[in-house]
UniProtKB/Swiss-Prot annotation:
Pfam families: Myosin_tail_1 (PF01576). GO terms for cellular component: myofibril; myosin complex; myosin filament. Phosphorylated. Its main location: cytoplasm. Belongs to the paramyosin family. Keywords: Coiled coil, Cytoplasm, Motor protein, Muscle protein, Myosin, Phosphoprotein, Thick filament. It is found in: Cytoplasm, Myofibril. This is Paramyosin. InterPro entries: Myosin_tail, XRCC4-like_C. Homodimer. Residues 31-853 form a coiled coil. The keyword Coiled coil applies. Most abundantly expressed in muscle tissues from byssus retractor and adductor muscles. Low expression in foot, gill, inner mantle and outer mantle.
Amino acid sequence: MSSLYRDLDSDVSSTRIVRHSYNVYRGSSPSSQNRLESRIRELEDSLDSEREMRLRYEKQSAELTFQLDQMADRLEDAMGTSTTVSEVSRKREAEVNKVRKDLELSCAQFEATEQNMRRRHQEALNDLTDQLEHMGKSKSRAEKEKNQLIIEIDSLQAMNDGLQKSKMSADSKIDALEGSNSRLKAAVDDLTRQLNDSNLSKARLTQENFDLQHQVQELDGANAGLAKAKAQLQILCDDLKRNLDDESRQRQNLQVQLAAIQSDYDNLNARYEEESENASSLRAQLSSLSATYAALKTKYDKELMAKQEELEEIRRRLSIKIQELEDTCEQLRTRCNTLEKTKNKLTVEIREITIELENTQIIVQDLTKRNRQLENENAALQKRCDDLSAENGQLRNEKANLEAECARLKVANAELAEKNANLERENAGLQNALREANNELKAANRTINELTALKAQLEAERDNLASALRDTEEALRDAEAKLAAAQAALNQLRSEMEQRLREKDEEIDSIRKSSARAIDELQRTLVEVETRYKTEISRIKKKYETDIRELEGALDNANRANAEYLKQIKSLQNRNRELELQLEEATRQLDDTRNQLSVSERKRITIQQELEDARSLLEHAERARKNAENELGEVTVRLTEVQLQVTALTNDKRRMEADIAAMQSDLDDALNGQRAAEERADRLQAEVNRLADELRQEQDNYKNAESLRKQLEIEIREITVRLEEAEAFAQREGKRQIAKLQARIRDLENELEADQRRLREAAASARKFERQWKETVQASDEDRRQVAELTSITDQLTMKCKTYKRMIEEAEDVASITMNKYRKAQSLIDEAEQRADMAEKNLQTVRRSRSMSVSREVTRVVRV
């Protein structure tokens, strides 16, 4: 109808203008007559066409004159809609260009992120393969130790058989000794003859007494060395106490930092609630807009039922837009749900951090218990030193009394029983250490399961990125198809407008020129807006690039710190090797002294060999304990490495969350410009669906990881049960053999007391000194070993505390960076909204001016 009115007005104005021109040029000069005749012919042709059109429109003139006043307003509205259609087409072209540029930028960003993710994924795979190889080696080592234990058990069984055979031979010897005793009773008379020999033996005993005094002096020197070692142990205990105080302070600092992190989390939760309220307000605005749009739609449906097919097509497009806006609303709801899920994940991670802090507190309590044990052992060493000094005084006073030395032999038997009890206590300590090692192995397996889950998550993210790239390509194709359709529609409109413009006169040309000027002004404003958006996008891109560079620099600094910590660990290992060399030198000196004492113990070789067999069994147990301690150290080192990898992965995860927050800001920008960027909303919908798929895949991967973890825990429990059974069997066999050896030693000592009292008493005194010296040396070695263990444990705890501090600092840095990014994005959104409002106001003013100018020109033509 609007086009019909426009044609009718143009025809009426042209007829009136022709008549007016004819009346003007009828009496002109003959110089311009030729030019006017050609003009008159053209005007006559136009008059003929106008007469035909007038005959065609005379029937409608009566109705149109009656409705002319009413349709003037409608004409203004229709002209406004036509201009809006042209403006919408131009805006769509500009938006298509923007979408292409955004797609190119997103493709470049996706390619860069894909390369980074591939590199990180490859590094994580390499680390995991190294850890799996290391675990395989440790497993093979455990199997070898198991085979060695089986071999040792077989050897113990063989030794048991040999001991039974030696028992039989000892019984036969006892029978022979009883016969010899009867013969000795018969030879009492011969002993009187041997009084002279006894005098000679007395002189020999005095010489041996002199030698024993010399040995007592040497033992005094050894006592002085033990006192020095005692002082050194006291210094080490003081250092350990200081370290424990420092660790308690560090634990308090960690608790304070955890409280700060909790407060930050509460602040973030409050901000999230504010954002949800803003989203609800946006939804309310959308609902109000949809209501207003429905009212306008009903109004125009009642008024414009008789319009052409172009307006119907525009109506269909608007209905499609409404559906797309409703889809975007649903997408926003799903995105809010995903944000709530991420919030739940963050709460779970905070709970895991609290669990790790509780584990550190348990480790500190274990260290305090070990410190108390060291203090108790130090008190026991002091008691031993006092006992040694008392025994030295007793030896000096009881040199002349052989009967008192027999009582001392009984005391030595009691000391052997005490030594057996001490060995049982040490065995219990070894069992506790093995249990701790098993607990740490369980923790290591738990961390390995977490790493496998993270690996699966990274693979799922890689697949999701590939699917997102495919979706973006499909969206680009759809956008190109829509652009081609829009261009075809524009071409059709252009051809129709050209046909109509050819039929119009010069006055309508002036109107067209004025409209072209207004359109040029609108295009200039649109170009300015586009340039502003482009500059803002480039500036935001530069900011993100600078943030990425800063994060890469922080990662390089963390790698450097890790290298420094590895250097410190190597230096500590070198120091440990030096201490082991010193221990080897001390053992060599002990071997020399043992060789010297073996000369005085030739008559007791058989008993000494049996005792050495028992000691070899104890040494095997100590070696197994050392191997378990070494494995424990390796497990702790492995745990530190796994923790570092977990921190790196958490940093990557936080970076991905920052990227997701940036995408959220982009989505908010798209909501602000949803009427002008519909295709961008489709792309965001695809990204939301992709994120939902990623969450589902992560849940599936988590379930698979849980099943694998349960299987590994079952296998570890079976292995620990087998090891405990083997240890219990070895302990039982060792106790039985020790009891048998003690019984045999008592029997042989009783026999030797009956036959060779004097020689046995001297040898027993020398043996007692040797035994005491060996006990003191072994006690000092055990104390040194325990001190070394405590130092290694304290170093490991300090490393763990440092790693926890570094993790907390990194978390604070990431939180501050994300907050800064969020504030920057919020400021950018506010600026973009202000600019959009200004642009809308400018467009409205231009439209009003355009509609006013067009209405004025139409009224002027109608009046003419």
